[in-house]
Amino acid sequence: RAVLRKGKSHYVCDERLKRRLQAVDLTRKSPRVREALLSLRDHLDLDMAEHLSGYDRTRVCVPKVCDCGRESCRYQCFMEVCASDWYQVQICNHNLLLADAIHRSLGRRPLLPEWSTLILDEAHKLPEAARQMFGTTLTAAELRTLIRALRGERYILAAETLEEAVGPALRELAHPWDGTRPFSHFVPFLARPHRTLTLIQKQIGTVLTHGTQRQLDQLQDKVSLFLQEQKDMIFYTAEDAHGGTMLCATVPDLTDQFRQTLWRQQKPMVLASGTLAVGEDFHRFKEATGLLTDGRVRESVSPSPFAYSKNCLLYVPSLPARQKAGQYYDKLTEEITALLDAAHGHALVLFTSYSAMAAVKERLRDQNLAYPLFTLGRNAIHTTKLFKNTPGGVLLATGAAWEGFDFPGDCVSLLVIPRLPFPIPDALKEKEREQYPTLHAFLRAVVVPEMQIKLKQGFGRAIRTETDTCVVAILDERAAKDQRYWKDVLAALPEIPITQDLHQVEAFIRGVKPDRYFQEGAA
């Protein structure tokens, strides 16, 4: 027996659902949204209600502090069963696993039952999860949640005052994250929210419900921390769950945290991922997670079951050195258009920034592209469904699309990577740079391996099953033959045929695709 464990926000709070159904006018909701809300009376998992509105979700989910005290609470009953030995396998995300390890290291009540073996899939994401769990994040969603909580308790003036105070910050955080705006850009937008939160805390903090009071205290502490910018922490930005920006603070060295929590548990663990190593070298991952000198570690690399040499072609043309922005995007769009014609659409273009994606999107639209064009924005699920159901379509994407989406079959028969995905030079990288004697040493030990791992993740969008066929095009002049990162690119990817000739791209597609594929592309 197995169970999927999620965070509280994924489950229904019976008490909050009851209050929501009493307060809402169901006749004013669309049939699908109404049925989704009513269906929660019969199941606990919010993710099962496909058409549940985002607002309804926030109103009925289990709060961070659950104090309903109901013996019949479905969530509490579920947690009791999970804590028993009823399930032989429990599946959770990295954050819950780390939270459990932190609890155990501090002598607190564990969040997960005792286990005999841990299998950690997608383990390459562990360092980022640790940065969040061992640090602090501030998101737009947290600010909005507090405003709604104040309204729900009828403190309308406080809610409206806070909403006005955080408005500029929310607008800044709503911009798609691409790492170009440093943490310092956002700090001035926190001063007014800080004053307002302090005022609300003084005036009504003691009369709020326990849950809302805790939200207020936590937000006040977070905003204060980000305004102070303590020297013993690193402050940076990252992408939130909705594609916007969140503010982050973390400790400089995560390796000690790993050793004191997760690795101190004397039990067998299997860390698995398709992108843990570059070739057969796990050095970068072990260094980031504090396993570099751990004698218990054993390594294994399994060959891919996919026939890349037969089903994949790598196109890396020789391009001129990067020109001015306008000229560069003109040339890039021209190259992408030629590739789309050679492959008859069916393409995914993975960008490293939203600005580059927007520039190419604008130029492709001006050309009256012959293929349906989609851009992955905030409504990612809806857009990916449309793309999958539109034969011959072209999807422009960035961010989570590098590793978070699955497009099997002919849907992605052309994968275009305009720029090599080097890590963004943020405060985290600046701190890490201090550990190396020269910039070159830092580049070779950290920057290039991280680029290679991200490139492998992006490349993984091309071939998803043993019968998939795809052309992968890397349009970064630094990746071309005999250029600076040519050998690094080859070391990151499986052995596949390589060409600089666009005609060979077209010939490859003609040779591996059925007739119906070309009818789709022409539709």
Label every PLM stretch briefly.
Residues R1, V270-G274, G345-T352, A356, ...:
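Conserved RecA-like ASCE P-loop NTPase motor core of nucleic-acid helicases/translocases
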Residues K64-Q88, A101-R109, K202-S318, K324-Y328, ...:
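A contiguous, basic/glycine-rich beta-loop/short-helix subdomain that forms a polymer-engagement track
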Residues R70-R195, G274-T289:
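Signature of the SF2 helicase/ATPase Hel1-core->accessory helical subdomain module
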Residues P317-Q327, N379-A480:
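Conserved RecA-like P-loop NTPase helicase motor core
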Residues T352-G377:
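Conserved helicase motor "Helicase C" RecA-like lobe of SF1/SF2 P-loop NTPases
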Residues A473-A523:
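N-terminal targeting/trafficking signals and adjacent low-complexity tails
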